[in-house]
């Protein structure tokens, strides 16, 4: 195991009916209440949150309309509103898009320049508004990490930020809040969580990490089984709970602590698909990841052999890739470029867009030609 420092200050409050307690943690504060397209008003979560805020005399200003691929223009608008209203914290009620937007707004609140400076490494995040979360969609683990991803609509760049100040203070994880999540969003969340786990698993440089390998394999198996249960029984509490906590653990730093250097090449390519064509994040990964595995099949032969055996009970690296791709397809996730409306003629534009993020992330071996070659496996 490699040396590491594990730091994660987010307090998790997990369980049924915990949403009603959010006001207790915000007592005496004035918060910016963020949410997405309004589904929380249809499923009752909005009413629970507002009732709790009023019970504990929490002042709040609402801002809704966050898109599945959150955009910079919203961050600008909401940051201006937060300053105007003298906000002292942010409450994000939603999934990764809402939480990521909250983090960008929190970072921009105290910064005199353009918040995009943080995304292009022109400035470092030194201070941010405190963030509180009521999770309604399991996928990104943004509820328990310090990262955020935002799309700049003008430059067509989907970039990320990270900083200790962006860890949420408290995140409420109530599995019942996910009972009404549509099947396509369940599928996207499942893919996202699995790829979060497997990027490190397949790209790590240090070989002897049995604890981390076991974590990843168990979590992937749990996500697969709970996803299948959820699609059959949307209100199966245990399935929702297992899925929710697995997705959080997939990117809260625990599974990668001690594995040494690792990378996220599939997220890099997926971000370009989202930036250019506004494709859901999970859908980009279900297309790109099997293609990346096929491209690297020989290089990853030993890892694929173990993955196939431990996760699917098979002893064949090609079949291991096929089984994962088959699972993605079985839950309704796209696995080919044509499934998201793209063809070979789009590959060059995606590869060109991805190069800048590859360079930002230090993935210099991912040239335009290499990225294009990988994407051809998704035709």
Give, region by region, the residue ranges found by the protein language model.
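Short Gly/Thr/Asp-enriched flexible loops that form oxyanion-binding sites at enzyme active sites
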Residues: 79, 98-112, 144-145
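Active-site segments that bind and position negatively charged phosphate/pyrophosphate groups
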Residues: 204-323
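ATP/NTP phosphate-donor binding region
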Residues: 1-89, 337
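A glycine/threonine-rich phosphate-anchoring loop and its flanking beta-alpha core
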Residues: 111-208
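Residues at alpha-helix caps and immediate loop-helix transition turns in enzyme cores, especially N-
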Residues: 44-46, 74, 101, 303, ...
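Short alpha-helical scaffolding segments that buttress acidic/His motifs in well-ordered protein cores
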Residues: 194-198, 240-251, 289, 324, ...
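C-terminal charged capping/lid subdomain of soluble metabolic enzymes
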Residues: 304, 310-379
């Amino acid at each position: 195991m490699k040396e590491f420092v594990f730091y994660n200050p987010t307090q998790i409050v997990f369980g049924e009916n915990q949403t009603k307690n959010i006001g207790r943690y915000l007592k005496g504060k004035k918060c910016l209440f963020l949410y997405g397209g309004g589904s929380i008003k249809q499923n009752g979560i909005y009413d629970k949150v507002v009732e709790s805020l009023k019970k504990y005399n929490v002042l709040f200003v609402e801002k809704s309309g966050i898109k599945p691929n959150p955009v910079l223009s919203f961050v600008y608008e909401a940051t201006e509103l937060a300053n105007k209203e003298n906000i002292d914290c942010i409450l994000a009620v939603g999934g990764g898009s809402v939480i990521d937007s909250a983090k960008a707004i929190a970072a921009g609140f105290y910064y005199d320049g353009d918040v995009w400076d943080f995304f292009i490494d022109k400035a470092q995040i030194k201070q941010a508004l405190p963030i509180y979360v009521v999770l309604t969609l399991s996928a990104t683990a943004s509820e328990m990490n310090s990262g955020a991803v935002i799309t700049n609509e003008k430059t067509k760049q989907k970039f990320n930020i990270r900083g200790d100040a962006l860890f949420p203070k408290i995140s409420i994880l109530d599995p019942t809040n996910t009972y009404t999540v549509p099947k396509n969003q369940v599928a996207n969340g499942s893919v996202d969580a699995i790829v979060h786990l497997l990027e490190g698993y397949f790209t790590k440089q240090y070989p002897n990490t049995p604890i981390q390998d076991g974590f990843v394999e168990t979590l992937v198996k749990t996500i697969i089984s709970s996803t299948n249960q959820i699609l059959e029984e949307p209100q199966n509490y245990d399935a929702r709970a297992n899925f929710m906590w697995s997705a959080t653990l997939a990117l809260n730093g625990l599974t990668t602590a001690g594995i040494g250097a690792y990378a996220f090449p599939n997220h890099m390519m997926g971000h370009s698909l989202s930036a250019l064509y506004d494709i859901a994040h999970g859908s980009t990964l279900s297309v790109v990841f099997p293609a990346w595995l096929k491209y690297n099949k020989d290089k990853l032969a030993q890892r694929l052999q173990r993955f196939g055996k431990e996760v699917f009970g098979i002893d064949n690296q090609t079949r291991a890739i096929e089984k994962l791709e088959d699972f993605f397809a079985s839950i309704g996730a796209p696995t080919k470029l044509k499934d998201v409306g793209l063809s070979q003629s789009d590959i060059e534009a995606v590869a060109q867009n991805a190069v800048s993020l590859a360079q930002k992330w230090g993935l210099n071996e991912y040239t335009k030609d290499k990225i294009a070659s990988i994407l051809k496996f998704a035709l």
